[in-house]
Curated annotation (Swiss-Prot):
This is DNA-directed RNA polymerase subunit beta'. One of its GO terms (biological process) is DNA-templated transcription. Zn(2+) 2 binds at C808, C882, C889, C892. It catalyses: RNA(n) + a ribonucleoside 5'-triphosphate = RNA(n+1) + diphosphate. The gene is rpoC. Pfam families: RNA_pol_Rpb1_1, RNA_pol_Rpb1_2, RNA_pol_Rpb1_3, RNA_pol_Rpb1_4, RNA_pol_Rpb1_5. It is an enzyme of class 2 (transferase).
């Protein structure tokens, strides 16, 4: 017996390994067919029987009723296989009407619209004509010269009717041949000799130098090669015969009232048949040419409408003016075959109902209404009733169940025992949206859900509904129990943190329980056991908040119990009792006021040290305790709890005075409108924060009172600080001031809302506020869709990313260090490397001991060693550098975040990555409005303070001392580092050009000491020498103009876009410095002291004045800032993963070198970089209005910005390489999510980046058959090169290219997956021509063909089956 049969027989429809798609030849279409459809009739209106030779003909397609011919001569099974001589129908099952096809012999050839109109048009590419021209021939507008003969006409030249007539008159009737219609196109395609054409194109490609031509040739060559490889004939793109799909797939259904509902396809087929028959008649009766031609054109249009209605010309519409649904429409879009029926099927054995809280349940249980369970488990109940002899037949069992006999309930209890059910809440944004539970039968009609799983489902109990699904087979039950049971999904796959965390009221209850108050009854009493304390509490000697001393036995590291005396409260001890005993989980972790964060950390600890079971029990008990005390605390709040601070009016008055001063400065012309705007917004931001801080102080410490019933802590404060509900943002609006609001375009309104909700808003404030809130609401609605679309694109690009082996053996890795922004460590190194594997052996920098072996997983214990060693950067393995050919290896991926262990083979990490990135997107967009449009804008940073006691190190220090003896930074890339005693970097700050340095290299500084300060709203231009100012090229009204401010009447000189000056001379406004002799001063780098001024710069000096070193000669105002919230964020994430060019993108230097400004060209500035080794210099042309961040003579490094903005990803890849690119994308995406407090592991983003970097572009074909400019898969490229080297040929060269996720999805190796994503017709057209083969490697294509996905258990079955086949072959 063969081994492979052990794994169960594959059904007939599943015995294939790959799927190939081709163009069908006319003979193939005829071979599928069971007969020609010649009549447009469908069924007889009286007898309702199909008409003979019509679209539903029983002779062609099979009998209407099982085993019964049409005329009724043969009935019953016994006549199976007989063909009735009277009506010609074969006696068989009526199911064949779903399989049998027919055909229509067309009277004239017709072009297939997909190959004609689907861009790029294949027919026109092959014939080397424009699509417009091909259409003119096909639709009988123009003739084409097939054979010029004796005339001087060109082959392939188009002629109108008149031109043809003229040519005939000129050269004679038979001098040349010109023809029209699909026949001529078919003939021209037939005549193509591919091998010859390929050679010609190849030679032309070698000789041509034009880039445009090259691109065109490569496209044509690719198409020719596709045809050669697939053995498709080009003339098959023109059809002589049309397939008719089986009638059951385009049904005609009778409605009550004698009317019929029919599929649109029947109508479209009828039009084709009618026109075809008419054409046949016309040809037979030798009708005039013009009539025949018109009929042929109409036939072409009818076939076009059948295949793809509306693609060309006006769509064919039905009586109600609704376009017919053609064959293409059946496949396309959300309602098409792929997405509606193949990827998303409806499921039987399912029910749905409203959910309610099941606080008495255990984590692995859910309450299922009895009625629902009875319906869902029917088949199981029937079989059990029969098995026990309670019912004799299935019918009897059915009756018993319908009557709801008492014994049925007993059987139901037994059937349900340990049979898990799946609960799902839509939208299912990540895999935790479907989990398995064991059902408990309950009365009522609502499903009961365990409260702690709400976070994973994002469910609340305000009327949410959930669906129940029943896993039927034993394998399905097993998978549900092992993989999907809620107890096995404690950690979130997105970030590895517990997702079963108490929330809302539970958190509030636990916070209340762990509060400790001063001066409570019985403070300082000593206890040694809990019973004693309970007694004291019962008799009111203490309260749960009294500070007491307690002797507690604790496990030490050796595993012995040691008594320790701790200061605590009874409430905290109650939580402490629930902790599992483990030396790593000390009482100190909960001996504090427990907030949501603390509870989460404790649950994490328990999971890491005590395992899953202990965690589940601990979380469950915490929940019960939290609910109990949330109830008995009786926390509520009223108006008095919203405290308005006394100092509010003082702060507001101060700010108003400040703003008056800004207005004054503005009216005196000292600052521009933009600067004033920024300063005003900033001042109000600070004021709002100050008011909020004062309010927080007042709320946090309620007034002291002798009243024993006095509230010791503010309820609102408690809710916010514990993390139960609300944020300080919202409390600020209740009791402080609402602060600044945004306009609908995202700009901040200068006048803030001074009132809060307690005092109430004025009419004007209310209007502004409503405006901001409305924006939030609209954003929410719009962003939900775009976020869902982003998730879909991400899943599609990453769906075939699966762990396929343990170790790929690569030595490569990426270097990571902690993320430092504004001198603060935002993401410590520890967080970035936890759960990754080391790429090299890692040693202690001082003692040189080995900390980690290469390829070893970095777990919590190793982290502590790395942190104590003070390492600040580490090489880790990454999916970006993994060298597995299919999929990714476990070692490069690292820890599976949902289990905390090394990822196992077969895990679908691509989908998990996509869900982890996409899910919070939707979450966040649903949450923009919680702040209600209040602007959240931090005041601009204008100085740097030391965050530690440390030593200063300054990188690229270029400083001048100005007239006030201040140190002014002149370098564009100055950085200030703070180092600890070992010389490790603790913080890093970028110091902008023009800042005042308050410390110097090598200084020791103390914490909070100011290091540097600057004006955040303008970019200054500063002199580095003293001298006399000379204005150059500043022509009033042309390159410079006095801008008189309307409000103040004060003129200031501003550089404007220079218009054409006399005789096209370019104006380049600049300031030169002259010495006493009137000559231009030379700078330290040998260049002359010239300062070019960009458009928009405001001059700070007059012509001819004397200035000294470090003075500001002009200011460039910065744009005023708009608010940041995730709506800015989601499009940013999409922009990154789609690899789009950002609007106003930066320009980056490709080499190290010195900057020089060349001669301007029209509206562009020319920046030239001269490398040090004086090789080729590189020029950049940039628009004049853009702000150039470098000065003439500056030295730039490769990758530095020349122009401000977000860099283009493709540039980063080209200049800096994959690692820098990956770091940049990860950093940017993380910044968006971090703003919202969402944590996603870096590796998920890396998986997506890996998928974006799958293709290479050939730069030099070497000795291979590849073409320069062709884009192919990375692994394919490596295989081709290996072959070339084996055969002694020169290998090809290529460069990695970055593709956006949509493009990458459409170019996957699997055409089925690509077709089901987007642009279905285009993908299928392309695949059919190339005769593509789908190896069915990814998840989507397997779902579509109805198999188990090759991930998880399916992956192992696949693996075992392959091994079994191998064994069988060996045995044979």
């Amino acid at each position: 017996m063969s081994v492979v049969n052990f794994y169960g027989q594959l059904s007939n429809t599943q015995q294939f390994d790959q799927i190939r798609i081709n163009i069908a030849s006319p003979d193939q279409v005829r071979s599928w067919s069971f007969g020609e459809v010649t009549k447009p009739e469908t069924i007889n209106y009286r007898t309702f029987k199909p008409e003979k030779d019509g679209l539903f003909c029983a002779r062609i397609f099979g009998p209407v009723k099982d085993y019964e011919c049409l005329c009724g001569k043969y009935k019953r099974m016994k006549n199976r296989g007989i063909t009735c001589e009277k009506c010609g129908v074969e006696v068989t099952v009526s199911r064949v009407r779903r399989e049998r096809m027919g055909h229509i012999e067309l009277a004239a050839p017709v072009a297939h619209i997909w190959f004609l109109k689907s861009l790029p048009s294949r027919i026109s590419t092959l014939l080397d004509m424009t699509m417009r021209d091909v259409e003119k021939i096909l639709y009988f507008e123009n003739y084409v010269v097939v054979d010029p003969g004796l005339s001087i006409l060109q082959k392939g030249e188009l002629l109108t009717e008149e031109e043809l007539q003229k040519a005939k008159d000129k050269y004679g009737e038979d001098a040349f041949t010109a023809s029209i219609g699909a026949e001529v196109i078919q003939q021209m395609l037939k005549e193509i000799d591919f091998l010859k054409l390929k050679q010609e194109l190849y030679e032309e490609l070698q000789t041509t130098s034009s880039e445009v031509k090259k691109k065109k040739l490569v496209k044509r060559l690719k198409l020719v090669e596709d045809f050669l490889e697939s053995e498709n004939k080009p003339e098959w793109m023109i059809m002589d015969v049309l397939p008719v799909i089986p009638p059951e797939i385009r049904p005609l259904v009778m409605l009550d009232g004698g009317r019929f509902a029919t599929s649109d396809l029947n109508e479209l087929y009828r039009r084709v048949i009618n026109r075809n028959n008419r054409l046949k008649k016309l040809i037979e009766s030798k009708a005039p040419d013009i009539i025949v031609r018109n009929e042929k054109r109409m036939l072409q249009e009818a076939v076009d409408a059948l295949f793809d209605n509306g693609r060309r010309g006006r769509a064919a519409k039905n009586a109600n003016k609704r376009p017919f649904k053609s064959l293409s429409d059946m496949l396309k879009g959300k309602q098409g075959r792929f997405r509606q029926n193949l990827l998303g099927k409806r499921v039987d054995y399912s029910g749905r109902s409203v959910i309610v809280v099941g606080s008495e349940l255990k984590l692995h249980q859910c309450g299922l209404p009895k009625k629902m369970a009875l319906e869902l488990f029917k088949p199981f109940i029937y079989s059990k009733l029969e098995l026990y002899g309670i019912a004799t037949t299935i019918k009897a069992a059915k009756r018993m169940v319908e009557a709801e006999k008492p014994e049925v309930w007993d059987v139901l209890e037994e059937v349900i025992r340990e049979h898990p059910v799946l609960l799902n809440r839509a939208p299912t944004l990540h895999r935790l949206g479907i989990q398995a539970f064991e059902p408990l039968l309950i009365e009522g009609k609502a499903i009961q859900l365990y409260p702690l799983v709400c976070a994973a489902f994002n469910a609340d109990f305000d009327g949410d509904q959930m669906a129940v699904h029943i896993p039927l087979s034993i394998e399905a039950q097993l998978e549900a129990r092992v993989f999907m049971m809620s107890t096995n999904n404690i950690l979130s796959p997105a970030n590895g943190r517990p997702i079963i965390v108490p929330d809302k009221d539970i958190v509030l209850g636990l916070y209340y329980l762990t509060l400790a108050f001063d001066n409570e009854v019985g403070e300082g009493m000593m206890f040694s056991d809990l019973a004693e304390m309970e007694h004291a509490l019962y008799n009111k000697f203490i309260t749960i908040h009294t500070k007491i001393k307690y002797r507690r036995n604790q496990l030490n590291a050796e595993g012995k119990m040691v008594p320790v005396i701790i200061d605590t409260t009874y409430g905290r001890l109650m939580v402490g009792e629930l902790l599992p005993s483990n030396p790593n989980i000390e009482f100190k972790f909960i001996n504090k006021q427990l907030t949501k964060k603390d509870i989460s950390l404790v649950i994490d600890l328990v999971y890491r040290h005590c395992g899953q079971k202990a965690t589940v029990i601990f979380a469950d008990q915490l929940m019960k305790l939290g609910f109990k005390y949330a109830c008995s605390s009786g926390i509520s709040f009223g108006m008095d709890d919203m405290v308005v601070p006394e100092s509010k009016s003082t702060h507001i008055n101060e700010t108003q005075l400040e703003i008056k001063e800004f207005e004054q400065q503005y009216s005196n012309g000292l600052i521009t409108y933009g600067e004033k705007y920024n300063k005003v917004v900033d001042a109000w931001s600070r004021c709002t924060d100050r008011v909020a801080n004062d309010m927080m102080k007042e709320i946090a410490t309620p007034p002291v009172s002798d009243d024993p019933n006095h509230q010791k802590i503010n309820a609102i404060y408690m809710m916010a600080i514990s993390g139960a509900r609300g944020s300080f943002q919202q409390i600020k609006q209740l009791g402080g001031m609402r602060g600044l609001m945004t306009k609908s375009n995202g700009q901040i309104i200068q006048t803030p809302i001074i009132s809060n909700f307690k005092e109430g808003l004025t009419e004007f404030e209310c209007f502004n506020s409503a405006n901001g809130m409305r924006k939030g609401q609209i954003d929410t609605a719009l962003k939900t869709a775009s976020s869902g679309y982003l998730t879909r694109k991400l899943v599609d690009v990453a769906q075939d990313c699966i762990i396929t082996e343990k170790d790929c053996g690569t030595d490569k890795g990426i270097e990571v260090k902690s993320v430092i922004e504004g001198g603060e460590v935002i993401v410590p190194l520890a967080e970035k490397i936890l759960g990754r594997t080391a790429a090299i052996d890692i040693f202690h920098p001082v003692t040189n001991d080995l900390i980690l072996n290469k390829g070893e997983l970095i777990n919590e214990a190793k982290l502590e060693q790395i942190e104590s060693a003070g390492l600040d950067r580490i090489m880790i393995k990454s999916v970006l550098t993994c060298e597995s050919t299919t999929g990714i290896c476990s070692i490069c991926y690292g820890r599976d975040l949902a289990t905390g262990t090394l990822v196992s083979e077969g895990e679908a990490i691509g989908v998990i990555a996509a869900q982890s990135i996409g899910e919070p997107g939707t979450q966040l967009t649903m949450r923009t409005f919680h702040i209600g449009g209040a602007a959240t804008k931090g005041a601009e940073v204008s100085s740097v303070e030391a965050s530690y006691d440390a030593k200063v190190k300054i990188i690229s220090r270029n400083v001048v001392i100005n007239s006030e003896e201040r140190k002014i930074v002149m370098s564009r890339n100055c950085e200030l580092l703070l180092l600890d005693n070992n010389g490790n970097e603790k913080a890093r700050h970028k110091i902008p050009y023009g800042a005042r340095l308050l410390v110097d290299d090598g200084d020791m500084v103390i914490k909070t000491q100011k290091l540097a300060e600057w004006d955040p709203y303008t970019i200054p231009i500063i002199t580095e020498k003293s001298g006399k100012v000379l204005f150059k090229d500043m022509v009033e009204g042309i390159s410079i103009r006095d801008v008189t401010d309307e409000a103040t009447g004060i003129p200031s000189k501003v550089i404007i876009e220079s218009k054409q000056y006399s005789r096209g001379a370019e104006l380049r406004p600049r300031i030169q410095l002259l010495d006493a002799k009137g000559e231009v001063i030379a700078l330290s780098n040998g260049l002359e002291a010239r300062y070019y001024l960009p458009v928009g710069a405001v001059l700070s000096v007059e012509d001819g004045v004397q200035i000294s070193v470090g003075d500001i000669i002009a200011r460039i105002p910065k744009e005023s800032t708009t608010t940041k919230d995730i709506t800015g964020g989601l499009p940013r994430v999409a922009e990154l993963v789609e690899a789009r060019r950002p609007k106003d993108h930066a320009v980056i230097a490709e080499i190290d070198g010195r900057v020089e400004f060349g001669k301007d060209y029209k509206s562009k500035r020319r920046i030239i970089i001269h490398p040090i080794d004086e090789t080729m210099s590189i020029e950049y042309m940039v628009p004049k209005g853009k702000h150039v961040v470098v000065n003439e003579g500056d030295f730039v490094k490769k990758g530095d910005l020349l122009i401000d903005g977000n860099p283009v990803l493709q540039d980063i890849l080209k200049v800096m390489g994959v690692e820098v690119l990956a770091n940049y994308i990860v950093k940017e995406v993380q910044a968006v999510y971090r703003l919202q407090g969402v944590k996603i592991d870096d590796k998920h983003i890396e998986v997506i980046i890996r998928q974006m970097l799958q293709k290479v572009e050939i730069t030099d074909s070497g000795g291979t058959t590849l073409l320069a400019g062709e884009k192919i898969d990375r692994h394919e490229f490596e295989e081709i090169n290996e072959k070339a080297i084996k055969n002694g040929l020169k290998p090809a060269e290529a460069q990695l290219i970055l593709q956006g996720i949509t493009k990458a999805s459409l170019q996957t190796r699997s055409f089925i997956s690509a077709a089901s994503f987007q642009e279905t017709t285009r993908v299928l057209t392309e695949a059919a021509i190339a005769g593509k083969i789908d190896k069915l490697r990814g998840l989507k294509e397997n779902v579509i063909v109805g198999r188990l996905v090759p991930a998880g258990t399916g992956y192992f079955m696949d693996k075992m089956r392959k091994a079994a086949v191998k064994l069988d072959e060996e045995n044979v």
